[in-house]
């Protein structure tokens, strides 16, 4: 697969730091961010690269040449083959694509030259190949979805809506944001070449929403643009600390698996109405701390109300949108939500017989945790299962996780759990931020 890197922008928001450097040449721990991008591509077998340049183009072209030389910073070979397209006039972030389409004969990876990423590109490419479509977006949750563009998708990851910052949005929504990495088909570039500047998102990709030809690939991996001095400083620290590299799914991850009812939200029995969903005190702060400490936050919840015919999948999705929205308002996010819709007991009015089965996903069965572990390359022995019931503890035990039982009142039962805490907030403060959280990192 060929990679196209858009490196022609002026970087006006970060001009005070960049000075006479094009933004892709800003150093991250001693190496230009563009060099780090090329290194990540090379390590994963992507060695055919086309870079579009414009503002201060010679600084990029003289540093990297055709890719056959060595880095002036490290002395190591670049190890890639580089071609260039020079914008004679600003063409927006996609105008150059139409002018290089004769060099693109298969689906290609499209990157921004000022974005720091550390992701498993092979997983991304495999998803795109399996699902087809004209374009796949790399999407992830963030700590400020309320002022970010949002991607809405169906259960097959087909994008149904693309909500820009300016668009009206629903009261509740999934925390899914376009990260700025794409895999595109050259078929998108057929037809007349547009005049002037072309906006990739608004003119090319957003119109595909709802057609079935635009997919989104959800991942917790590190992708961050460095378009402001504050973001640039944060990226530098994330690279120096190892946080960026640790999130790559080629490396083993550690997770906190979370029950939902009674752990995240107030327990009301069978939760059937979205208005009954209410975050427990301290939960948003706890999940935010899980995010900050580098653990994946994964919800695994039994929802027999589906099998009972009392809640539809669409209604459950709305409840989970509310959960993500409330967490997002406090700067917290979930990396994934898994639910089991089944229940083994049959013979009740209104039930859905096809879901009244014995399954491998209903806790204490391990199915949801195993699915998450495969998807995110999770080391279960380094992870925690946290919940307020026996089935939560047993599910964790069944996959080799450490377990924590939440018990706000009375004496907690002894179920073999490693820790007991009054709330999720207390668990995070006592365990993840303490010695036990450190020893398995």
Per-region residue spans from a language model:
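A short, conserved beta-strand element in the Rossmann-like catalytic core
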Residues: 91, 115-118, 223, 263, ...
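Substrate-recognition element of Asp-dependent hydrolases with the DxDx(T/V) motif
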Residues: 52, 283, 287-323, 330-347, ...
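Catalytic-core segments of class I nucleotidyltransferases/pyrophosphorylases
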Residues: 108-109, 116, 122-129, 140-145, ...
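Conserved Lys-Pro-Asp/Glu-containing loop-to-beta segment of HAD-superfamily phosphomonoesterases
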Residues: 109, 352-354, 360-390
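Active-site neighborhood of HAD-like aspartate-dependent phosphohydrolases
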Residues: 253-297
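Conserved N-terminal catalytic core of the sugar/cofactor nucleotidyltransferase
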Residues: 2-5, 27, 31-113, 121-123, ...
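N-terminal nucleotide-binding beta1-loop-alpha1 segment
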Residues: 1-19, 44, 251-261
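Acidic, Mg2+-coordinating phosphoryl-transfer loop and its flanking beta/alpha structural elements
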Residues: 384-421
């Amino acid at each position: 697969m060929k990679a196209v890197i858009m490196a022609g922008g002026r970087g006006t928001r970060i001009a005070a730091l960049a000075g006479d450097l094009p933004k892709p040449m800003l150093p991250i721990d001693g190496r230009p961010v563009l060099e780090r991008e090329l290194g990540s591509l090379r390590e994963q077998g992507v060695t055919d690269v086309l870079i579009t340049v414009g503002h201060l183009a010679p600084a990029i072209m003289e540093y990297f040449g055709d890719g056959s030389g060595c880095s002036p910073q490290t002395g190591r070979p670049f190890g890639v083959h580089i071609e260039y397209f020079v914008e004679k006039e600003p063409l927006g972030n996609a105008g150059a694509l139409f002018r290089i389409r004769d060099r693109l004969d298969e689906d290609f990876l499209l990157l921004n030259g000022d974005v720091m990423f550390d992701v498993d590109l092979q997983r991304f490419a495999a998803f795109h190949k399996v699902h087809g479509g004209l374009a796949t977006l790399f999407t992830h949750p963030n700590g400020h979805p309320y002022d970010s563009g949002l991607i809405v998708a169906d259960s097959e990851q087909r994008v149904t809506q693309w909500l820009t910052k300016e668009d009206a949005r629903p009261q509740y929504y999934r925390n899914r944001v376009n990260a700025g990495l794409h895999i595109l088909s050259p078929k998108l570039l057929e037809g007349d070449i547009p005049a002037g500047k072309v906006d990739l998102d608004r003119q090319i990709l957003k119109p595909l929403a709802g057609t079935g030809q635009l997919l989104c690939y959800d991942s917790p991996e590190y992708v961050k643009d460095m378009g402001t001095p504050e973001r640039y400083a944060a990226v530098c620290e994330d690279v120096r600390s190892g946080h960026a590299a640790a999130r790559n799914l080629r490396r083993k991850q550690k997770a906190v698996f979370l029950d939902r009812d009674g752990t995240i939200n107030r327990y009301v029995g069978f939760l059937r109405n979205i208005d009954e969903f209410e975050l427990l005190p301290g939960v948003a702060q706890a999940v935010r701390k899980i995010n900050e400490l580098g653990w994946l936050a994964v919800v695994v919840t039994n929802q027999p109300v589906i099998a009972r015919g009392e809640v539809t999948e669409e209604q459950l999705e709305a409840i989970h949108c509310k959960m993500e929205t409330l967490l997002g308002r406090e700067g917290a996010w979930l990396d994934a939500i898994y639910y089991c819709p089944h229940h083994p007991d049959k013979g009740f009015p209104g039930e859905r017989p096809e879901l009244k089965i014995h399954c491998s996903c209903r806790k204490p069965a391990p199915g949801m945790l195993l699915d998450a572990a495969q998807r995110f390359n999770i080391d279960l022995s380094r992870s925690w299962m946290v919940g307020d019931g026996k089935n939560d503890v047993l599910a964790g035990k069944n996959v080799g996780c450490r377990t924590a039982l939440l018990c706000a009142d009375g004496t907690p039962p002894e179920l073999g759990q490693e820790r007991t805490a009054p709330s999720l907030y207390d668990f995070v403060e006592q365990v993840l931020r303490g010695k036990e959280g450190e020893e398995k990192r």
